[in-house]
């Protein structure tokens, strides 16, 4: 049998007719139309509940205590990992050099070097803070930290 355009038909079950609900008990989906009895889901706009609403029970965000805060200082200070300094040329490193190398985001006003990984070059940090471990690693590589 050859395939012809006028003989084409969709596969069985590929196209089903839309179920019409609420059109009499004979259809099997009359009266409540598949929504059950009463409750918010049976009503118009039902099932739309606010995020965090727990049915009248005191919600989790009100049961738990308030803790901590976001430091505005932390937002202004960028963290630079010590191994990232190896991307720069050996020598003097200041805040402008870190910004130029995209190691510090534009919103930051200060930077602090934190120890992670190894240092292979000699750096002189100027006007950039460093943790005790990072300072020791920079000095071990032959560099120095000038506040």
From Swiss-Prot:
Task: Give the lineage.
Answer: Bacteria, Pseudomonadati, Pseudomonadota, Gammaproteobacteria, Lysobacterales
Summarize the protein's role.
Binds to the 23S rRNA.
Query: What organism, scientifically named, is this protein from?
Result: Xanthomonas euvesicatoria pv. vesicatoria (strain 85-10)
Please give the PROSITE patterns that the UniProt record associates with this protein.
Answer: RIBOSOMAL_L15
UniProt biased composition (Basic and acidic residues): 1-20
- What's the family? Belongs to the universal ribosomal protein uL15 family.
Q: Does the keyword Metal-binding apply?
A: no
Q: What is one process in the GO biological process aspect for this record?
A: translation
Top-level taxon: Bacteria
Its recorded name reads: Large ribosomal subunit protein uL15
Q: Which InterPro entries match?
A: Ribosomal_uL15, Ribosomal_uL15/eL18, Ribosomal_uL15/eL18_sf, Ribosomal_uL15_bac-type, Ribosomal_uL15_CS
Which stretches does UniProt call biased (Gly residues)? Answer: 23-33
Subunit comment for this entry? Part of the 50S ribosomal subunit.
PANTHER family linked to this entry: 50S RIBOSOMAL PROTEIN L15, LARGE RIBOSOMAL SUBUNIT PROTEIN UL15M
Q: Which stretches are tagged as biased composition: Basic residues?
A: 34-47
Output a single Gene Ontology CC term carried by this record: cytosolic large ribosomal subunit
Q: What Gene Ontology molecular-function terms does this entry list?
A: rRNA binding; structural constituent of ribosome
Q: Where is this region: Disordered?
A: 1-61
Provide this UniProt record's keywords sorted from A to Z.
Answer: Ribonucleoprotein, Ribosomal protein, RNA-binding, rRNA-binding
Name of the encoding gene: rplO
Indicate yes or no for the key word rRNA-binding: yes
């Amino acid at each position: 049998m050859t395939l012809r355009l006028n003989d084409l038909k969709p596969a069985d079950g590929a196209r089903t007719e839309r179920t019409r609900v609420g059109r009499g008990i004979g259809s099997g989906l009359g009266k409540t139309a598949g929504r059950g009895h009463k409750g918010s889901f049976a009503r118009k706009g039902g099932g739309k509940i606010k995020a965090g609403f727990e049915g009248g029970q005191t919600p989790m965000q009100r049961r738990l205590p308030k803790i901590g805060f976001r430091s505005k200082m932390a937002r202004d200070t960028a963290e630079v990992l010590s191994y990232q300094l190896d991307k720069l040329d050996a020598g003097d490193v200041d805040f402008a050099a870190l910004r130029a190398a995209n190691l510090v985001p534009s919103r930051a006003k200060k930077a602090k070097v934190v120890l992670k990984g190894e240092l292979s070059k000699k750096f002189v940090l100027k006007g950039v803070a460093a943790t005790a471990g990072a300072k020791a690693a920079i000095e071990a590589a032959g560099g120095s930290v000038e506040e």
